[in-house]
Amino acid sequence: MDMPKVTLEKNNKPTIVLMTRWHAIYRCKSRLSKDIGAHQASKIQEELTNHTIEVAKQIQKKGLANIKVAIDGIGIQAAKKWGLKNKVRNVAIQGPGNLGTKMKRQFFKTQSEKTIPHEVPNSILLIGTDLPSISNCDLIEAIEILTHNEMVLGPSTDGGY
């Protein structure tokens, strides 16, 4: 599959914010754990998170985006240590609230970190980690679409965002 071509201004890189949960047993994938057990469900959470981070890092290496991981279920110090281990410099805690509240918070926090007064804010991609088939082509396509549109919603067949 040919990758879409994306041309970005040097200082106009979007940020891909990965929304994930810490892979602690009994604290993630609660619906799945009922069928396969909490230990196996936590392993799946960890694998999905690692896969999504690796795909996003490929985009970052190409100079097309910055990445940030917003994690839930772990403290900030442990999150930063985990981020260093995974070669992710920008790690944040999601904070309290439902998923919509957490997404809104990360959007505005990321926008405020990036915005220079009197400049158009850079694009922000919020994605979850329950995407086993996500590829760098998917992210590049989203970045390309965001260069021409204010918002992009990707398809979801499981009721998520």
Regions found by a protein language model. Give the residues of each.
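Short phosphate-binding loop-to-helix
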Residues: 80-122
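Short, charged/polar "capping" segments at the starts of alpha-helices
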Residues: 74-80
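Short glycine-enriched, charge-decorated loop/helix-capping segments at active-site entrances
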Residues: 31-40
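Short aromatic-hydrophobic micro-motifs that form the base-stacking/packing surface
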Residues: 123-127
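Short beta-strand/loop segment that forms part of the nucleotide-sugar
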Residues: 65-73
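N-terminal nucleotide-binding beta1-loop-alpha1 segment
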Residues: 2-32
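A short, N-terminal amphipathic alpha-helix
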Residues: 45-63
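Conserved donor-nucleotide/metal-binding helix-loop-beta segment in metal-dependent transferases, i.e.
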Residues: 132-159
